Amino acid sequence: MGNTLFFISLSLIWVMLLYHMFLMQGGFRHYMTFERNIPKWRENMKELPKVSVLIPAHNEEVVIRQTLKAMVNLYYPKDRLEIIVVNDNSSDRTGDIVNEFSEKYDFIKMVITKPPNAGKGKSSALNSGFAESNGDVICVYDADNTPEKMAVYYLVLGLMNDEKAGAVVGKFRVINAAKTLLTRFINIETICFQWMAQGGRWKWFKIATIPGTNFAIRRSIIEKLGGWDDKALAEDTELTIRVYNLGYHIRFFPAAITWEQEPETWKVWWRQRTRWARGNQYVVLKFLAQFFKLKRKRIIFDLFYFFFTYFLFFFGVIMSNAIFVVNLFYDLHLSVGFLAMILWILAFFLFMTEVMITLSIEKTEMNKQNFFIVFLMYFTYSQAWIVLVIYSLFVEIKHRLFKQEVKWYKTERYNQHKSG
């Protein structure tokens, strides 16, 4: 029995490791080629479309001023741009700060959510903002984001030059990466996610996931889909599946860059990532239940990726860890004990290799300090994710059983400028 469980757990772990090695190669290839189309795309852009940028905001007085300054500095004709801040049930000075900007710049305006939609979450806030927008292209940014000057232009450039693209997603970087050890972990995690999961899947399968920020989507698509799902905690992943089901693809175009804050304490990280994990579990369960109604095979492939990530892979890791701990105190008579040790060591070195090669894509991230951080990350941050996924699954099941209402979770913000 012990041997069987061991082989199952190890198989699940190695399938995911090898798949991510494959994705890493794709991400690296995409990095080498994605800028080649820019000159040709620029020539093709005879006229820029009207763009509406939606910024959902709930008690964001700490960061909203910096975000709006970045919006003012965007390289995009202001007569073709509208910035809509959705003030969702804020009790701080968010509204006052937005009003300061709207009085000075006529392309900035504020939408205030009203009952019964006020305070219902990001999806509901986006729907309120969308209803007041008139752009042919809709961009979304979180309230803590500082997009680079060319970000929106590049998102539009990628979208308008690809008729099959329903949406284009850019790259986000961690603005407070050097603040704490946790933010250094998150910085490495986000780089790997974007170049492996986003860049790799785009290169090999023409698949990418809409993130919560720094993306552009066609207005016509949002209208066809009836807006964002206000029951989804991971509204971005949920929207992704529905866009693919319409027959479009989602392009990963890392020329469009934004900088965002990440949690600086474990408590804030736990709450935020629990919401993310629950959101993705909701999406997997929602669309697996509609499995035979899905029209596009590409979606099915991506659903299995999320199912494997949030269910089977973590099950394999948990089982592997449990076997290791139990075997310390009780001999399970594993016939492959030595082989197990070799495979565990190889898995660790493969993890280190994948991450360091991916970090080499970002010029400033391939250094000795990050090597030791990745080493430490394997034994701490990665293990914390395992506990979090178990907890989030428990919370999501309880949420479904008791039919609890989706609430906006406010991630803590910090006063700062770009670091590290």
From Swiss-Prot:
Gene Ontology molecular-function annotations: glycosyltransferase activity
Name under which the protein is recorded: Probable glycosyltransferase YdaM
CDD domains given in the database record: CESA_like (cd06423)
The organism's taxonomic lineage, starting at the top: Bacteria, Bacillati, Bacillota, Bacilli, Bacillales
Keywords recorded for this protein, A-Z: Cell membrane, Glycosyltransferase, Membrane, Transferase, Transmembrane, Transmembrane helix
Pfam families reported in the protein's UniProt record: Glycos_transf_2
Principal location listed in the UniProt entry: membrane
EC class (word): transferase
Disulfide bonds: none
GO cellular component: membrane
Membrane topology: Multi-pass membrane protein
EC number: 2.4.-.-
Family from the record: Belongs to the glycosyltransferase 2 family.
Designated gene of the protein: ydaM
Locations listed in the record: Cell membrane
Segments crossing the lipid bilayer: 4-24, 299-319, 332-352, 371-391
InterPro entries: Glyco_trans_2-like (IPR001173), Nucleotide-diphossugar_trans (IPR029044)
